[in-house]
């Protein structure tokens, strides 16, 4: 799957807690390194969207000021 595919999957989730559960599940089940990298990028992107109040951003377009709040 691509980063965009994972991001669309993660956008169905509206809470950080649920996102972390899905992230943990995928982290243990995926074996391909490129798949893991794509999933990590999408999960981080979705975390940024959630901490910004639910605003949606294009991939690579999250403002630097938002990343400060992502844990």
Curated annotation (Swiss-Prot):
Disruption phenotype: At 0.3 M NaCl up-regulation of 1 gene and down-regulation of 6 genes was observed; a double cnu-hha deletion up-regulated 134 and down-regulated 5 genes, most of which are thought to have been acquired horizontally and are also up-regulated in double hns-stpA deletions. The record marks 44 as: Interacts with H-NS. Keywords: DNA-binding, Transcription, Transcription regulation. It holds the Pfam family HHA. One of its GO terms (molecular function) is DNA binding. InterPro entries: Hemolysn_expr_modulating_HHA, HHA_sf. GO terms for biological process: bacterial nucleoid packaging; negative regulation of DNA-templated transcription; negative regulation of single-species biofilm formation on inanimate substrate; positive regulation of termination of DNA-templated transcription. Disulfide bonds: none annotated. One of its GO terms (cellular component) is H-NS-Cnu complex. The keyword Transcription applies. Gene3D superfamilies: HHA. It comes from the Bacteria. Expression becomes maximal as cells enter the stationary phase but decreases later in the stationary phase. Belongs to the Hha/YmoA/Cnu family. Forms complexes with both H-NS and StpA. Modifies the set of genes regulated by H-NS; Hha and Cnu (YdgT) increase the number of genes bound by H-NS/StpA and may also modulate the oligomerization of the H-NS/StpA-complex on DNA. The complex formed with H-NS binds to the specific 26-bp cnb site in the origin of replication oriC. Can complement, at least partially, the absence of the Hha protein in hha mutants. This is OriC-binding nucleoid-associated protein.
